[in-house]
Amino acid sequence: MREPLLQLIVLSLIIIVVNTQFESGRLCFCKGFEAVEPCDCSKPQTIDKLNNHRIYEKVQKLLKKDFFRFYKVNMDKTCPFWADDRQCGTNQCGIAFCDDEVPAGLRRRNAVNMEAAAVKEEEDDDAEKCADAGNNIDPMDRTLHDDEKRQLDAMDHHDDGLEDKFCEIEDDESDGMHYVDLSKNPERYTGYAGKSPQRVWKSIYEENCFKPDPKFDKNFLTNPSNFGMCLEKRVFYRLISGLHSAITISIAAYNYKPPPPSLGQFGSQMGTWFRNTEMFAGRFGTKWSWEGPQRLRNVYFIYLLELRALLKAAPYLQNELFYTGNDVEDAETRKAVEDLLEEIRAYPNHFDESEMFTGVESHARALREEFRSHFVNISRIMDCVECDKCRLWGKVQTHGMGTALKILFSDLPHSHYKQDSSKFQLTRNEVVALLQSFGRYSSSILEVDNFREDMYPGESVMNTAADGPPRKSNKIDL
């Protein structure tokens, strides 16, 4: 009798604590004893102020550079877990996918010597075919200019240090690998909904071998919780929840309202992009679930984890040339990287990876390997996403998170690496994915502040920032 009563008391306390997380005075987040805790926005060390005042503008400036804009990816890999015909549930979430539209300089090496006239003819034909297909709301842009092709041919390089991978690694020279300009394909609403994304997220949460109840059911997917887990299991859960939540924030921040049906298919009015505060409040508030604010905390947790990975990789990044063939821009990129690292170094409250995978060596190694292998599977699940743009960003973000985990955990004492193995190697694609992933979480935290101002006027941390990014209106012009 005492045990159920104790559990009820603990649950009640949890609900009370969580319900205070969105009350005035506790709207921001700070580094806590283990991870992230709600705190007063007036505190100087809030993660919100770090990001919105000091980090956000610098990382966005960096991601506009050629070295970081282009990501090499195979968008045609088969889903390894179930049959997938890549047909979206609506005609709004599909996008045009035309391999031959990719410029000759970025195709596989045996196609580079094709005659320019033939290539141009193929590209024109494919572009015409693509014009009538795919996502009507936000199609994926695969175009590259000639000077961009030449730079990318020179800037792509890779290494052999892939033994400790935390995500599915694609061979840069394999068939199907093509460059995508991420600046032309921002993460936002695409209309992708229904059974397909539900199946993907169900599989991702099922891949979480650390869930409290070994028998997975829909209640865990609806209201997942890390209550009762050890540190490593809580970290794994937070990675999944934080990824899910960051994607939801992007969709809510860049949501789409279609034109009135009365206009018909010949109507000239376009739909409206807007910030969907109601969607944000429903997902991250406490109206429907006490778990809402916890989901936000997991976004901040991944932000701190990737911030720590960037700090740990700082010596490597400082020696990187970030070569694109444009000497002026390459120098600007190196300066932008150093400016970002300087801000990261100044922050005192970083994630501490040394607390993980400790104890008996054999158990720690087994737990670390289980952690690694299950995260690899999550990265593979991204090939099962039917919406191309959603799949692209799913692959980028899991690749970036996997790179962060590789940096943080590959040189721990119980790793299969030697104790003094501090000179890890990264591919160009890993560096791009890590910064792009960090950029997504940085943007999410800024958007949280925009939503915070909508829901609690005057509580935004940006109200006190004279040099921060301008606040967005509820209606978004793209």
UniProtKB/Swiss-Prot annotation:
Positions bound to FAD: R188, T190, W201, S241, H244, R283, R295
GO biological process: IRE1-mediated unfolded protein response; protein folding in endoplasmic reticulum; response to endoplasmic reticulum stress
One term under GO cellular component: endoplasmic reticulum membrane
Disulfide bonds: C28-C41, C30-C39, C79-C384, C88-C93, C209-C230, C387-C390
Transmembrane segments: none
Annotated membrane topology: Peripheral membrane protein
Subcellular location(s) of the protein: Endoplasmic reticulum membrane
Glycosylated position list: N377
Residue segments, region Disordered: 117-143, 459-478
Oxidoreductase as UniProt keyword: yes
Signal sequence region: 1-20
Main location per the UniProt record: endoplasmic reticulum
Cofactor: FAD
Record function comment: Oxidoreductase involved in disulfide bond formation in the endoplasmic reticulum. Efficiently reoxidizes pdi-1, the enzyme catalyzing protein disulfide formation, in order to allow pdi-1 to sustain additional rounds of disulfide formation. Following pdi reoxidation, passes its electrons to molecular oxygen via FAD, leading to the production of reactive oxygen species (ROS) in the cell.
Enzyme class: oxidoreductase
A Pfam family hit: ERO1
Subunit and partners: May function both as a monomer and a homodimer.
Similarity comment: family membership: Belongs to the EROs family.
Chaperone listed as a keyword: no
Gene Ontology molecular-function annotations: FAD binding; protein-disulfide reductase activity; thiol oxidase activity
Keywords annotated in UniProt: Disulfide bond, Electron transport, Endoplasmic reticulum, FAD, Flavoprotein, Glycoprotein, Membrane, Oxidoreductase, Redox-active center, Signal, Transport
EC number in record: 1.8.4.-
Name of the molecule in the record: Endoplasmic reticulum oxidoreductin-1
